[in-house]
């Protein structure tokens, strides 16, 4: 959106690579805490059920693929948690859901044997986190939905130019907002502990 607004004033923004790495000398490393499975007794729905619901929403809109970069949406969808962000049980990662497959982009050191088995049993492919742009550049899908408010420009610009990019709200945010019985019970229990 910013690129379009600047272009109206004959200004151009070109960002290649990580613009901060050359000036931020003591930048902390990416977090490397392991991912862990969020038990179904707390989640209330399996990740298969959630992925099926997401695919149904995508089909209604004629969308083939959804790229998710919001960490809370990824954690909710896959029933996985982590400790990568202080006071937030999320994992630095990306998720691509198509009508045919699911690909999870995560740093290999975060994937324990238990999590790897969990993902494989659910036919969720694992790709390296830092290979997401290369993957998207060769993505063969007809169209892909991204939430522009939650997706950075580097990811956006790496999507295969032959793929139609649809900008809109992620259906995961709306699905996640509808709490099931186990989630409501968890909220009540947390409030009682507070």
Where are the predicted features?
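Terminal domain-start leader segments
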Residues: 1-193
């Amino acid at each position: 959106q910013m690129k379009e607004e600047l272009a109206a004033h004959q200004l151009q923004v070109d960002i290649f690579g990580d613009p901060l790495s050359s000036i931020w000398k003591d930048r902390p490393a990416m977090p490397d805490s392991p991912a862990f499975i969020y038990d179904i007794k707390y989640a209330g729905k399996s990740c298969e059920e959630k992925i099926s619901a997401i695919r149904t929403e995508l089909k209604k809109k004629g969308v083939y693929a959804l790229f998710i970069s919001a960490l809370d949406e990824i954690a909710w969808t896959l029933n996985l948690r982590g400790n990568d962000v202080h006071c937030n049980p999320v994992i630095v990662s990306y998720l691509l859901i198509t009508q045919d497959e699911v690909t999870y982009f995560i740093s290999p050191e975060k994937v324990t044997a238990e999590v790897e088995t969990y993902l494989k049993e659910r036919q969720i492919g694992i790709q390296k986190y830092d290979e997401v742009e290369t993957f998207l550049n060769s993505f063969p899908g007809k169209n892909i939905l991204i939430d522009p408010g939650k997706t950075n420009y580097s990811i956006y610009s790496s999507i295969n130019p032959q793929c139609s990019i649809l900008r809109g709200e992620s259906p995961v945010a709306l699905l996640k907002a509808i709490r099931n019985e186990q989630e409501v019970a968890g909220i009540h229990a947390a409030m009682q502990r507070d």
